[in-house]
Amino acid sequence: MSRSSPSLRLPVLLLLLLLLLLPPPPPVLPADPGAPAPVNPCCYFPCQHQGVCVRVALDRYQCDCTRTGYSGPNCTVPDLWTWLRSSLRPSPTFVHYLLTHVRWFWEFVNATFIRDTLMRLVLTVRSNLIPSPPTYNLDYDYISWEAFSNVSYYTRVLPSVPKDCPTPMGTKGKKQLPDAQVLAHRFLLRRTFIPDPQGTNLMFAFFAQHFTHQFFKTSGKMGPGFTKALGHGVDLGHIYGDSLERQYHLRLFKDGKLKYQVLDGEVYPPSVEEAPVLMHYPRGVPPRSQMAVGQEVFGLLPGLMLYATLWLREHNRVCDLLKAEHPTWDDEQLFQTTRLILIGETIKIVIEEYVQQLSGYFLQLKFDPEMLFSVQFQYRNRIAMEFNHLYHWHPLMPDSFQVGSQEYSYEQFLFNTSMLVDYGVEALVDAFSRQSAGRIGGGRNIDHHVLHVAVEVIKESREMRLQPFNEYRKRFGLKPYASFQELTGETEMAAELEELYGDIDALEFYPGLLLEKCQPNSIFGESMIEIGAPFSLKGLLGNPICSPEYWKPSTFGGEVGSNLIKTATLKKLVCLNTKTCPYVSFRVPRSSGDDGPAAERRSTEL
C-alpha cells in the first residue's frame, strides 16, 4: 500500500493545530434551581378536533391530525369537505328544537320510510363519536396493547390531565380545586323538590338503576378505574351474575330456568339459603329474608328487587315457551337461548321507551338492527369511565316514596326486605309509575340522603384526572362555554362558581353536566344529551345479537323467540308476568282518566 504524500499531510496538521488553539467549550451546568421548569405543552390542550397531543423534548409538542379532517400545528385548518360539512351542519340546539316541536310533521315522518333513514343517520353519527377499538384508560394516556386488551379497565375517551401541569385542570383555574363537600352542598343539594317537566316517574328511575348496574360495577378492591362487569355492555349480568359460579348458584338446572321461591302464591327470587350467593344486606337480616339475584346490591331498594323479580319471571316464562316449541332441547340450550331473547327484549325496551322518554323527541325511535347492516359498524363495546360518571342521576330520587296511602322515608325504604312481598309486584309498579321523578339538570336537586354519592363521583374524577368539562364539549362537537353565566343561564350560581373555580375552562366534568341549564321543558341540558347518547347507542347497537351473524330467527329459537324481541314492551314485561295489569309507564299519567283500576284488567297476550 502506498504511503500518503507529504502534500496531503500538511493540511491535516494545520487543522489539528487550529483545533488545539480554539477555546474550550463552555461546561454543561445544572439548571438554575430558581428557574421555572418548562410547562408540559399538552397541559394547554392545544390540539383541536380530536387531534392527539404528543410531547416532544421538554417544551415542544406535535399534534397528530391524522384522519381528523383538519391540519395545521393545532389541527385547526379544515379541508374542503370538512369545512363544507361543518358549515351545513345544524347546531344541536336547533336539532333538539326541531325534534321536540311540530308534532304533525313528525307524525307524518313516523308513518313513512323517512323514519328508518333518520334513525340510521342518528345511530351512525352518534356511534361514530365513540372510539372503537378503545383507546385510553386510567394508566395509559397513549395507545397501547394493554389499554386495548385488558377488559378489567374502564376505557376513557380523553386521556387524563398530565400529572405535571400547573393546575389540576391543566393551566386554567386555581391551584386547588374546591372542596367536594362544599361544592355538593352549595350547588347540588336539593332545597325544594323539582319534578322532571317531561313527566318522568320512579318506574323510570328504578329501571335506570337496575339496567345500568349490569355494566357499571366499579371494583372496590382495584380502584375507580377498574370494573367487575367484564361484559362491558348489555349482557344481563345483573340477572344472571357476573361470573359462572354465581350463575350456577342461581340456576335451577331444569328446563333452562332460574331458581325461585313462591310466597303468598307469587314467584319471587330465591332466598340466599336456596341460592348461596353474596348479597349486600345489613347485618342482622337472616339469609332466608335475603333474596338472591345476579347483582349483589339490589337488596338496597325495593324498586331494584321489583325489576329483578319481573325479569326472573320473564326468563322462566320464555323458557316454557321455548320448551313447548323445542321439546328436544336440553337445559343448557334453553337457558342460553332465553338469555339472548331477554337481551333483545331489554334493548328493545331501552331504545323505544326508555330513551324515547329521555329524549322528549316526536321522532319515534326504533330498534331494528338491520338498519345498520348496509353501513360500517363494529359490534363490540367497552364501557368508559366518563359514561359511568355521567350516569349518576341521583336527582331522579324523590324526598320520600309514596306507595298507596303510605309515605315511606329513606330510612323506611332502604333495605326494606318485606315491602315487595307485602304489597306485591302490581301495587309497586302502579305506585312507582304514578310518582314523579326529579329533574336531573340545572343543579340543586339531589336529596341529602344520596348527596354523598355525588361527592364520591367528584372525588373519583379528580383521582382519575378527568379533563375539564369544556374539553369534553369540544370532543363531542359542541361549542365550549365562554362563561359560567352561559353555562347556568343565571347570575347568582354563576358568580359563586366563578369564585370557586376561577375560570370556566377549569370546571370539572360531572359538576358541569349537572349544573348546565336544562333545555326547554327537558330533564337535563345539552351536554348530557350530546355526550350521553353516543355512549348509550354504541353500547346498545354494538351488542353481538345486533350483528348480521346473530340477528336471525334461528339464534332465538325460531320465529317464536324472534317475535318476543320484536314485540317487547315495558307493559308486556309487567302484565305477562302478573295476575292483574297495573298502570305501567315511564311517565306519570297525563290525566286521571288515561288508566283504570289495576284489579279490573287481567293479563293477556298484549
UniProtKB/Swiss-Prot annotation:
Gene3D superfamilies: Haem peroxidase domain superfamily, animal type, Laminin. GO terms for biological process: cyclooxygenase pathway; response to oxidative stress. Glycans are attached at residues 74, 110, 150, 416. The record marks 536 as: Aspirin-acetylated serine. The keyword Translocase does not apply. The active site is at residues 213, 391. Belongs to the prostaglandin G/H synthase family. This is Prostaglandin G/H synthase 1. It comes from Oryctolagus cuniculus.
